[in-house]
């Protein structure tokens, strides 16, 4: 990637109902950063990610993409973002192949069909490409969603529990992909309970309403 990118948070605070999940979240992540958000269930990790991408409202503070608040540049920010949440976001009536083809068209990805076949093989769906997603297992549906990572040109990847329903080999394949994306100038931010091993990985932990590195 020829550009440098930066995601910055300033004094973010999150409250859900009467519960304060976290306060005073100040971080700067730049091109090359590979970051894991840690913390026990229900502590606010998913809420943080949803605030970072503009899907949830913070109580206080602001999120900046390349120095500009994301609220004032939604179209640009969405173009630069790939977000994968708890739900796969795939179309159950479409096959694995059709889902990837649909994503390719929607994202204006110019990679050829050879790349689609390569990605299907990488995620272990070769031979199942013509089966409707609704008939596949949860793990296989998750792989369809994750396959979009190999097709994406977005510099910012924000991923909520990307290793869910993925075997040990799949975890290593994804970790390698995340490392490659970071070393090529992208930013990867994800939540996971997995003990991810990478020399590039930075860890941020949410505990007692605060984040620490």
UniProtKB/Swiss-Prot annotation:
InterPro entries reported in the protein's UniProt record: AAA+_ATPase, ABC_transporter-like_ATP-bd, ABC_transporter-like_CS, ABC_transptr_haem_export_CcmA, P-loop_NTPase
NCBIfam families (UniProt xref): ccmA, PRK13538.1
Residues the record lists as binding ATP: 39-46
GO biological process: cytochrome complex assembly
Localization per Swiss-Prot or TrEMBL: Cell inner membrane
Protein name per the record: Cytochrome c biogenesis ATP-binding export protein CcmA
Listed transmembrane segments: none
Catalytic activity, reaction form: heme b(in) + ATP + H2O = heme b(out) + ADP + phosphate + H(+)
UniProtKB keywords: ATP-binding, Cell inner membrane, Cell membrane, Cytochrome c-type biogenesis, Membrane, Nucleotide-binding, Translocase, Transport
